[in-house]
Amino acid sequence: MRHHGKILTAGLLAAVLWSGAAGAETILSRGNGGQPETLDVHKSVGIPESWIELDLFEGLLSPGPKGELVPGAAESWTVSDDGKTYTFKLRADGKWSDGTPVTAGDFVFAWKRFLDPKTASPYGYFIDQVVNAKDIRLGTKPADTLGVKAVDDRTLEVTLVGPTPYFLATLTHHATFPLSRANLEKFGDDWVKPGHMVSNGAYMLADAVPQSHVKLAKNPEFHAAADVKIDTVNYFVTEDVDGELQRFKAGELDYTYTLPNQQIPDLQKTMADEVRIVPYIGTYYYTVNLTHEPWKSHPELRHALSLAIDRDVMVGKITQGGELPAYTFVPPGMSNFAAWTPKEAGETQAQRDAEAKELFAKAGYGPDKPLSVEISYNTSENHKKIAVAIGAMWKQKLGVDTTLTNLEWGTMQSALRKKEYKDIGRTSWIGDFDDPSNFLDLFRSTAGEQNYPGYASPDYDKLMDAAVVEADLAKRGQTLAQAEQLFLADQAIIPIYYYTSKRMLSTKVKGWQDNVLDNHLSRWLTVER
């Protein structure tokens, strides 16, 4: 899905809360990390955007209370015997927030827009398994050749290039949501603004104030509106993790986006009932800019920096939230994957340090030729502390001089996509669904802007292409493992740890169910005041 990313003054926050607090209205206040870049479902990337979009829109399928797949805009579907053709029957009562019906044509329109090279969606590769999708987004075939057809207003047919075990799971993702063609044609790029946006989910966009909040109101046209208990949802920008915690303690937030790492041990003692730390399918990593030297042609240099990071210290002393050291990109426990263990994962840190020094010297660096590195990260004390610790490890073991540059969430995401970060950039990937392809597709040469290092390997692409058409799940898992081994041997990124989701959750919030994708749609929750 996705990437992790000024908080309101107390007075302004209170004003936002009060503005929707008339009568018996139920309000949920969510800490949401960084400022959302956009609410255009085809152009957004990060978690701050995706959580809001999951409340605003509904795909063919939807994440249920436990993160499981449940019917969304489609009430049912069938799959052909060869596993290549999916036929979806849309709900008769599916409506846009303006009262017009949601049709199969809305999905066809949206998917064509999604793949249009002019849209330049960072997620364009996401439905490459659909017939001709890849060629359309690369501009080599016209949009009308896409393997998606509106048989009638309530019947959508999708044809794939081969059996795809995870296809249904992709349909909960914001990139595959429908859009109202009439709405986009009326407002153009301004369709995402409050008062303009038409959505088909449980909520409508009521207000959006940059660096402050996004306010959603219950959608009376939603097919399950009678079951939605929360009337208003406020998503607050909370890049200041310490400030976010203080506002939670003051009762201004019902739950937080994350926790200050250094305060986790104390919080687990003093506020144990409200601390939630659970497994999460995601990897925190540093990406290396391969568009220029010295990174472009020195894999041994990149590998040396990776080996010199003591990941056990990182998760034990710095993050302190139950994270696990990462030596691969695909998190442990993912389905349809032949899990493997890199050599360095079984070594001591002393062995890794010795190898790092050898590789560093082999790359031509040392006391007579020192290396200077800039680490860029999005604003967060948590990210800063990690970067400081890693810089200290590199200095102590390899003599590397490190400078830190922090950027606001949107600026950092732009720098990553455009390869404008100088040397190394902090980022992460959180699984959109339980399949390793969701992680490994990022580094195809045709993946576009989300290929942050600018990695390109014909051999890697061939393995990933082979996995797409492999019907045998065991063989497919082995092929994907081979692709990851090749990719990590090239060391275009530096995995650091596997995530846990960690936050404060008020005991007043009911209906919350932990899940490894950390999807918690507001429609499934309620708040007892």
Where are these regions (language model features)?
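N-terminal lobe/hinge region of extracytoplasmic solute-binding protein
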Residues: 31-81, 196-199
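Aromatic- and charge-enriched surface segment that lines or borders ligand/interaction sites
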Residues: 75-126, 157, 247, 295
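Alpha-helical secondary-structure segments
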Residues: 103-110, 153-159, 163, 201-202, ...
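Gly/Pro-rich hinge or "lid" segments in bacterial periplasmic/extracellular proteins
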Residues: 134, 139-143, 149, 153-154, ...
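Extracytoplasmic/peripheral linker and loop segments enriched in polar/acidic and small residues
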Residues: 148-149, 315, 349, 400-412, ...
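Extracellular/periplasmic solute-recognition and catalytic clefts
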Residues: 206-217, 234-292, 316
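Structural transition elements
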Residues: 325-362, 380-385
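Long beta-strand-rich cores associated with HINT superfamily self-processing modules
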Residues: 503-529
